[in-house]
A protein has these predicted regions:
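Mixed-charge interfacial surface used for oligomerization/domain docking
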Residues: 15, 25-43, 49-228
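Glycine-rich oxoanion-binding loops at beta->alpha junctions
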Residues: 1-9
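Glycine/small-residue-rich loop that forms an oxyanion/phosphate-binding "nest" at active or ligand-binding sites
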Residues: 18
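Short, well-ordered beta-to-alpha junction loops that form the rim of enzyme active sites
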Residues: 21-22
């Protein structure tokens, strides 16, 4: 019950900024917007993302709040940041996508026969197929990681989430090895995918989720540093 949730939060804070999953992938955004109409000081923002990529936006918003940014500053920067989150998953098998009606049975059979693996992107709050990789797991994982990190100059290397569904330890270690090879990060977190990702992408899917360098993050980070 969002109204009760917001009411409880407002006993602890003067304003609430609630960041939701992509509005076209979940009912959470619309339900939160409806509940927020009962309050003057609750703002609901569509993150445009799912799973750990939404978490990156929340982490930045929390960082701004802890460093005494205004409500307006947080809202504006969060909306800007949405376009600088890299959020894509590669699918090991299209069976779950077929079951969910996202691809036809014919496409699923073709992908199985040719070892094709769709890459799902989050764009404008929607999940769309943004490309294909080919081959067994080791080949498709290497190709996907190399493609994601092909323009490493524009990647914020502080935090990377390797978000996965139904994957064994050996495969996770292999992905981490590829990350270290192509684009090492200061901190790497292994994170099980949200139900929205897992139910659409199926077991064996994984994504590399991170921020791209952008003026909103750089400017605020510099401004919040204490004077020497």
């Amino acid at each position: 019950d969002y109204e009760r949730f917001f009411a409880e939060l407002l006993t602890l804070a003067q304003n609430v900024i609630h960041i939701t999953m992509a509005k076209h992938a979940s009912d959470g955004y619309l339900n939160a917007v409806e509940a927020a109409k009962s309050f003057e000081n609750v703002t609901v923002i569509d993150s445009g993302h799912l799973s750990s990529s939404m978490g990156l936006i929340v982490l930045f918003a929390a960082y701004m709040a802890e460093h005494h940014a205004s409500k307006r500053e947080i809202i504006e920067n969060v909306k800007t940041l949405r376009d600088y989150i890299s959020s894509a998953f590669i699918i090991d098998s299209t069976h779950m996508m077929c079951r969910a009606g996202r691809v036809s049975k014919r496409v699923q059979v073709l992908c199985d026969a040719l070892l094709l693996h769709p890459v799902i992107h989050l764009r404008k709050s929607r999940m769309t197929v943004g490309g294909l990789e080919m081959g067994d797991f080791s080949h498709m994982a290497r190709s996907y990681v190399r493609r994601v990190f092909r323009d490493a100059r524009h990647i914020d290397r502080r935090i990377l989430f390797i978000t996965y569904a139904g994957m064994d330890e050996e495969r996770l270690k292999y992905i981490q090895q590829l990350v270290r090879q192509y684009c090492p990060f200061e901190r790497v977190y292994l994170q099980k995918a949200s139900s929205a990702i897992a139910s659409n992408c199926g077991p064996g899917a994984f994504g590399l989720l991170f921020m791209k360098k952008n003026e909103a993050v750089i400017s605020f980070s510099q401004a919040s540093k204490p004077d020497m």
